[in-house]
């Protein structure tokens, strides 16, 4: 502590003592007003004695208070008590002074019990040595305090210490600002990084969806075809560009990446008829098949005619076609066209060898063109009509028989006779071996003027051929039916074929197996055919392999 601070402490203590003395004077005036009520005995201490007691008490307090060393250059009294005695005039003390005297003086100067005196205010003094001077709260200061009593600083030195402590705390808190700024920078970085990750994730998700969408068909409901030519030597990137320009894919680059990812490396050149309803996967599979050397008309549908179908069955199959065709392809229109004499005449002129022996109008044939439409799969295009479709089937039969025309003629057979025999062979046998044996039986019976006795012809006459016929129904057929197709009663062949025979049945009928067999019966449950060269053996085969299974 500096010397200046010590001097200020002494002066402050002095001022406090003077205030206490002024307080004593105030108490003296109060006691004078109360003398009318309370009278003290004759031996009551005088004001001078009370003042002496007060000074003794102050001296006692000062002796117990810690001393503050003074600077040698300053003329400061050795003790605060001496300074007060020199500067303070004698003031009579009031009996109600609440400052206690020393124990010695209190025991020696006070008389015995006397009349009741005003109760003295008790005060507590800090007897613990301290390095700061003790201050008292004056009456004026107490009067100014309206609210609850709050502790008052002991000295100005304490205030200085507290102010210094506050300043040091404030000054010590200043270096924390860079930490806050650093934390704010870190927080901003973390937020920015999280936003970046969110944007990156969103971009990846939408990018993935964009690629998937690019692999889907351009128009899933489109039925139109687009003709595209892929030049020889084109790489997958060039093919993707070509397809993008044709409006078949959204992005050629994505198409090429997908082709490489799926390892589609064998894409072929040529002309293709592709649809916008095809996905990227469908386009790649189509490009693997290879295109045509020249542009072809797009195929809207395919028509498959099974082997052994009758014209009625073929008409029904045509009527099931669906597509945006040039004209309506119905079963009724098909049957009407195959019976159109003008169309038949044009066909005979177009395919003279094939239709040279075609049944005449009054032959009793149900359909003159029955058996002349080759069973196969046909492409139905936008320009396909009923007439063009029938013509295509006739052309297919003419093409397949062209290799056998000379052989047929050498066997003294007409095309109509060959196709009629082949139509029966088609239904009677399933295996090529059996078909050749059955064809041989028919030739043997024809050569002997024996009726063919084929149930197939009777079923056709009844309009049941092609239907699911049980073994019992087959055995119970009406062999007395009045029809040119009743080969049980009529000797020789029917007016014409009863179905469209397969190429295998045709070849089996041309190259039949020669034998002396005149009879055969098939066990439909086992698919086995039993042959005989006489009626007795044949009847035994029928009883054993057919009739025994009817029960």
Curated annotation (Swiss-Prot):
It comes from the Bacteria. The gene is mltG. Its EC number is 4.2.2.29. It is a single-pass membrane protein. It is found in: Cell membrane. The chain crosses the membrane at residues 188-208. Interacts with RodZ. Interacts with MreC in the elongasome; interaction is strongly reduced when the 90 C-terminal residues of MreC are missing. Interacts with KhpB (also called EloR/Jag) via MltG's N-terminus, suggesting the N-terminus of MltG is cytoplasmic. Residues 159-174 have a biased composition (Basic and acidic residues). Residues 1-187 are cytoplasmic. One of its GO terms (biological process) is cell wall organization. Belongs to the transglycosylase MltG family. The record marks 428 as: Important for catalytic activity. Residues 38-180 are annotated as: Disordered. Disruption phenotype: Essential, it cannot be deleted. This is Endolytic murein transglycosylase. Functions as a peptidoglycan terminase that cleaves nascent peptidoglycan strands endolytically to terminate their elongation. Residues 209-551 are extracellular.
């Amino acid at each position: 502590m500096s010397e200046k601070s010590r001097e200020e402490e002494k002066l402050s203590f002095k001022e406090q003592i003077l205030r206490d003395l002024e307080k004593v004077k105030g108490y003296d005036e109060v006691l004078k007003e109360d003398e009318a009520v309370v009278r003290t005995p004759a031996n009551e201490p005088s004001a001078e004695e009370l003042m002496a007691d007060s000074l003794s008490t102050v001296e006692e307090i000062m002796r117990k208070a810690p001393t503050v060393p003074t600077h040698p250059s300053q003329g400061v009294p050795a003790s605060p008590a001496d300074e007060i005695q020199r500067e303070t005039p004698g003031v009579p003390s009031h009996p109600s002074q609440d400052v206690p005297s020393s124990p010695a003086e209190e025991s020696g100067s006070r008389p015995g019990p006397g009349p009741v005196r005003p109760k003295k205010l008790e005060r507590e003094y800090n007897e613990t040595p301290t390095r700061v001077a003790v201050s008292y709260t004056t009456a004026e200061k107490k009067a100014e305090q309206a609210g609850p009593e709050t502790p008052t600083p002991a000295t100005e030195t304490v205030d200085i210490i507290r102010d210094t402590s506050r300043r040091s705390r404030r000054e010590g808190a200043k270096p924390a600002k860079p930490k806050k700024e650093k934390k704010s920078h870190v927080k901003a970085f973390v937020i920015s990084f999280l936003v970046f990750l969110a944007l990156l994730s969103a971009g990846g998700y939408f990018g993935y969806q964009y690629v998937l969408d690019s692999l889907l068909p351009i128009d899933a409901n489109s039925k139109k075809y687009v003709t595209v030519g892929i030049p020889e030597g084109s790489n997958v990137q060039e093919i993707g560009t070509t397809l993008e320009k044709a409006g078949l894919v959204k992005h050629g680059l994505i198409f090429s990446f997908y082709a490489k990812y799926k390892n589609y490396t064998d894409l072929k050149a040529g002309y293709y008829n592709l649809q916008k309803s095809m996905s990227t996967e469908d386009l790649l599979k189509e490009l693997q098949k290879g295109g045509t050397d020249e542009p072809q008309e797009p195929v809207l549908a395919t028509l498959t005619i099974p082997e052994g179908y009758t014209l009625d069955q073929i008409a029904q199959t045509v009527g099931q076609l669906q597509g945006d065709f040039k004209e309506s392809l119905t079963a009724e229109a098909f049957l009407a066209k195959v019976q159109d004499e003008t169309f038949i005449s044009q066909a005979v002129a177009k395919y003279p060898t094939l239709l040279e022996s075609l049944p005449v109008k009054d032959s009793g044939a149900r359909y003159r063109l029955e058996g002349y439409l080759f069973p196969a799969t046909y492409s139905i295009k936008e320009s396909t009509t009923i007439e063009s479709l029938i013509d295509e089937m006739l052309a297919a039969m003419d093409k397949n028989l062209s290799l056998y025309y000379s052989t047929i003629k050498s066997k003294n057979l007409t095309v109509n006779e060959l196709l009629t025999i082949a139509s029966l062979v088609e239904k009677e046998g399933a295996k090529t071996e059996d078909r050749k044996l059955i064809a041989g039986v028919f030739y043997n019976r024809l050569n002997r003027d024996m009726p063919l006795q084929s149930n197939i012809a009777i079923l056709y006459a009844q309009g049941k051929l092609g239907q699911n016929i049980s073994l019992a129904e087959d055995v119970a057929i009406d062999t007395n039916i009045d029809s040119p197709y009743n080969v049980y009663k009529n000797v020789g062949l029917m007016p014409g074929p009863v179905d469209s025979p397969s190429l295998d049945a045709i070849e089996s009928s041309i190259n039949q197996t020669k034998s002396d067999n005149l009879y055969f019966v098939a066990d439909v449950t086992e698919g086995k055919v039993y042959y005989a060269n006489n009626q007795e053996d044949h009847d035994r085969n029928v009883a054993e392999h057919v009739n025994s299974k009817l029960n």
